[in-house]
Amino acid sequence: MKIIEVDEELYQYIASQTKSIGESASDILRRLLNLPVSGVNLTAVDLTQSTMNSTNEEKGTQLPAEKNVVAETPKPSSEQEIRTPARKQSTQSIQHIVTKVKNLLQSEAFQEESKMVVRFLNILSVLYRTNPESFAQATEQETSQGRTRTYYARDEATLLAAGNHTKPRQIPDTPYWVITNTNSGRKMLMLERTMQFMELPEELIDEVRPYFAVV
């Protein structure tokens, strides 16, 4: 795997093109450049100096010398998939979400709630209200290419198109709808993916997990 230094503006652009949770930077660049999908998972785009120079010669441009530095790094295993957030959140923003979610989990109403679907909707509601932009980007990943089901939508009709059995419910205080006919494990997986994309710590995800465990 190769590492190449890019400026902040270019990084933000590449990251904003994420289409699915777990999509690697290589996958994004291959799609943007209309290159065939690699047969090997997480194969990095090999941007060596010679490759970069030849590409820029075709475009009639020259890449600044300081951006040509590449370094060898070990190739990540399949368990170390690169998750590329659409926009990097500040530590303060992340901590704000963490605090709000913890307040919900520790609230008397949440602790006494017996319906798992209500807990599910309440957590999604807090995630949206604390950072609508990041939540929107996260839910888009769940409805993007590669998914066999549509989990989130901005209207009930979109989810009902897959059948009345999906039991769409509007997430409280948000413009989003979500299917609710999933089992507890799937609900937790949906929350986990969303929270990971929003860059929330694994410790917080682990605090949520027991509320969706099958007793």
Curated annotation (Swiss-Prot):
User: One biological-process term from Gene Ontology?
Assistant: regulation of DNA-templated transcription
Organism domain of life = Bacteria
Q: Where in the cell is it found?
A: Cytoplasm
GO MF terms here are: DNA binding
- Provide an example Pfam family for this protein: SeqA_N
What InterPro entries is this protein classified in? Arc_rbn_hlx_hlx, Ribbon_hlx_hlx, SeqA, SeqA_DNA-bd_C, SeqA_DNA-bd_C_sf, SeqA_N
Residues folding into a coiled coil are: none
Region entry Interaction with DNA, spans:
181-187
| Function recorded in the entry | Negative regulator of replication initiation, which contributes to regulation of DNA replication and ensures that replication initiation occurs exactly once per chromosome per cell cycle. Binds to pairs of hemimethylated GATC sequences in the oriC region, thus preventing assembly of replication proteins and re-initiation at newly replicated origins. Repression is relieved when the region becomes fully methylated.
Subunit structure, as described in the record = Homodimer. Polymerizes to form helical filaments.
Family per similarity comment: Belongs to the SeqA family.
**Name recorded for this polypeptide:** Negative modulator of initiation of replication
User: What is the species listed in this Swiss-Prot or TrEMBL entry?
Assistant: Mannheimia succiniciproducens (strain KCTC 0769BP / MBEL55E)
